[in-house]
Amino acid sequence: TALALLGLPGSGRTTALLGPGSPLSFQTEPHGLLGLGHWGRLQLRLSLTLHPESLAWAWRLEQRNLGTEPIETTLVMTQDVGLADYGAIRLNEFYVSQYLDHQPLTDPKHGTVLAVRQNQPQGSRHPQLLASSLRRTVAYATDALQVFGRRARETQHLPAPQLPLPSRRLQHEHAMVALQDEALSLAPGGGGHTGFVFELCLH
């Protein structure tokens, strides 16, 4: 999973909220993780919450503008999906990826919901994943090539996502769930939250 926050007026800056370059410090919680920190004039609180009874989890980002000018931010989530046995993915993830079917669905409140199904049987099952914004998805992608372009092959670190996401289904060799959340406008001293929710179904 990768979460990228884009914002800070006039800068075009981007930060990864997960991984070694994250501005957050993480600690474990009873049902997930909690990350706290600052990025520029933004105070950030990122939580990962696991559902206690279902195969579901949610990322929630709370932001507060500590500056004296308005700020607009955009949160982008990317999830590398396999929906297959661990051994099969480690053996050839490109092969596994070709059997994933992506279906963008439309929800009147939350915008695009991405449904992903593994068409190659895993035992007797075909795992499915649903991914949605907690607010409203305004754009999506289904392959890493759409998100990072060919630049990702030329560097050890992933480049910033290419926005806006194309909102077009591409079923290539690097299946990815990518959702671009509706921009969040923060007045001076104001706060707001964004995030994404996932549910795994084993049918």
Protein language model regions, located:
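Predominantly extracellular/luminal cell-surface or secreted proteins
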Residues: L6-G7, T78, E199-C201
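Residue-level preference for alpha-helix termini and adjacent loops
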Residues: D80-G82, A178, S185
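Short Pro-Gly-centered flexible turn/kink motifs
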Residues: I71, L184-C201
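Polysaccharide-binding surfaces and accessory modules of carbohydrate-active proteins
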Residues: G35, L50-E53, W57-A160, G192
